[in-house]
Amino acid sequence: MTTRKRNEFLDIVSDDDEGSDRGYDSAAAEESKGRLAKRRKTHTRADDLSDEESDFGRSESEDESKTRLKGKPKSKSQTTERSNDSDDEDEADDGEKMQVDQYLDTTAAHSPSQSRSQSPSASSVSSKPTKLKKKPLDKVRPPKKNKTGVIYLSSLPPYLKPFALKSMLETRGFGPITKVFLTPEVPSNSAPRRRSNKRKSYADGWVEFASKKTAKICAETLNATIVGGKKGGWYHDDVWNMKYLKGFKWADLMEQVQRERSEREAKRRIEDTRARKEDKVFLQGVEQGKVLQGIQKKNEEKKKKKGETGPGEGEGSADAAAAAAASELKVRRLFKQSEVKMGRDKVKDISTLEDDAKRVLSKIF
């Protein structure tokens, strides 16, 4: 029996044997193919260097094998085993090369097809521009007709509030009410002032309904009738006085209210200006009277100092003093003005003045 010089269990297993034990893994194969393709595309120089190193390693291994063959004669069985191993390695290398070539062929075959498949889609996208749908413009709608109706209330119950009036009409089925306008009652100057009562009373008013029909029916049914309600109510015995205003709109009412308000303000403005003028005239008179009183006092003091009135004159002197004072009040005050030195009335020869003026002007110009 021949003894085994190599221990198969202690030797390092080759990569080919490991691959045969693991079996075929498609994911791993695809990863390895991808890695090989990437290396060939990007790192060509590194691959060349690695090939040179592998060739150099193979040459060294061949030299070592030759020296061993020369030194030790081996049996036929060992030589046949090694030859078989080398054949297997060559076949494995050929298989790997074939796989790489097939991968390259498949990538080359798939790339034009993919480019063709992608190109029509891109061309279709570019050739078909996005069509913007034109939205139809909104048709110009005609303005809605104003179908509101307005009624006029010539008189209102005392201390009736606007929301109470609205609730009264709506409870009787006349609605919907859109707007209510009541004019406050202006108290007359002769009427006594009531400071304790803070409630307001209104003279007349206007009520706008959403439809003309309800306004007409309301005016026809409630006009000249009592307000009604609870028997002991505050407004039970008061009478409605209302009229439907044909062709009258709320805008017309606002114009009328504004016009009346402007007229009222204009009258008040005129009255204010008139009152200011009267006050101004009165103050001027008061000031003038004070001035005259001061003048009288000064004149009396001067007369007393001079001693014009003697002790034996009696009643005649007193009457004369009163008459003099009355005459002084009526006399206008005169102020002495300064005279012009070279007036025309004082210049005798006007021609000489004109000659002098001409001479001076001729020198200047």
Curated annotation (Swiss-Prot):
Every RRM domain range: 149-239
Comp. bias regions, Basic and acidic residues: 20-34, 55-67
Location in or out of the cell: Nucleus, Nucleolus
Extent of Low complexity compositional bias: 111-129
Region (Disordered): 1-146, 293-322
SUPFAM superfamilies, per database record: RNA-binding domain, RBD
Main localization category: nucleus
Entries under InterPro entries matching the protein: ABT1/Esf2, ABT1/ESF2_RRM, Nucleotide-bd_a/b_plait_sf, RBD_domain_sf
Keywords: Nucleus, Ribosome biogenesis, RNA-binding, rRNA processing
CDD domains: RRM_ABT1_like
Keyword set includes Cell inner membrane: no
UniProt keyword rRNA processing, yes or no: yes
GO biological process: endonucleolytic cleavage in 5'-ETS of tricistronic rRNA transcript (SSU-rRNA, 5.8S rRNA, LSU-rRNA); endonucleolytic cleavage in ITS1 to separate SSU-rRNA from 5.8S rRNA and LSU-rRNA from tricistronic rRNA transcript (SSU-rRNA, 5.8S rRNA, LSU-rRNA); endonucleolytic cleavage to generate mature 5'-end of SSU-rRNA from (SSU-rRNA, 5.8S rRNA, LSU-rRNA); small-subunit processome assembly
Gene Ontology terms: cellular component: nucleolus
Top-level division of the source organism's lineage: Eukaryota
MF-aspect GO terms: RNA binding
Function: Involved in the small subunit (SSU) processome assembly and function, and in the 18S rRNA synthesis. Required for the early cleavages at sites A0, A1 and A2.
UniProt family annotation: Belongs to the ESF2/ABP1 family.
Name of protein: Pre-rRNA-processing protein esf2
Organism name: Neosartorya fischeri (strain ATCC 1020 / DSM 3700 / CBS 544.65 / FGSC A1164 / JCM 1740 / NRRL 181 / WB 181) (Aspergillus fischerianus)
